[in-house]
Amino acid sequence: MNPFYQQARFLISAARPDAFPTDEGMEVAFAGRSNAGKSSAINVLCNQRALARTSKTPGRTQLINFFALDESRRLVDLPGYGYAKVPEAMRKAWRKLMEHYLGERACLKGLVVVMDIRHPLTDHDWTMLGWARERGLAVHVLLTKADKIRRGPAMDTARQVARALGDAGIEATVQPFSALKREGVEDAHGILDQWLGLTAEPEARAASE
């Protein structure tokens, strides 16, 4: 566990671009389908129980949450997507906010896309990955809830996802991850370290290698 991430603290929740922190420094954003385990992953990576609040009502939170690691580095929790019961007006507002953040944020260095390892690459995941490709963003895929299946099938799924992304022209690293068992934390930290300028070389072992 890299102690650097344990100092993460809540900075601000933003419903509009004009509420975002100043566009400087470095940010890494986390995106994922509702119930994919995004908030739990952020909490485990920062070794905090309730840094990113989990919701029992998927799709309810439509804010972008910023967490400060130090004066110039931030983690960003994007709204969960893909929940069918969210009203159409809310979906449109969410999409506009996300397009603005992903398209205009100069300090954004990478995007972590969180997927349930049992249900990876949904249509909404592909939409998010398409935005990242258009922007030229670095992408890392966390296949969460890896404790739900055996290690062999988990690694097979990671390789299959990496292959599918490569076939789609999307450069990405992919790894299984379990918030419950805290598996994959060091690999994920290696990617974050690279994007946030904390190390010269990536330390994570990508399934695609």
UniProtKB/Swiss-Prot annotation:
Entry-linked InterPro entries: G_ENGB_dom (IPR030393), GTP-bd (IPR006073), GTP-bd_ribosome_bio_YsxC (IPR019987), P-loop_NTPase (IPR027417)
Chain positions recorded as GTP binding sites: 32-39, 59-63, 77-80, 144-147, 177-179
Listed transmembrane segments: none
GO term, biological process aspect, one: division septum assembly
Domain EngB-type G: 24-198
Keywords linked to the UniProt accession: Cell cycle, Cell division, GTP-binding, Magnesium, Metal-binding, Nucleotide-binding, Septation
GO MF: GTP binding; metal ion binding
Any Pfam family matching the protein: MMR_HSR1
Protein name: Probable GTP-binding protein EngB
Organism: Thioalkalivibrio sulfidiphilus (strain HL-EbGR7)
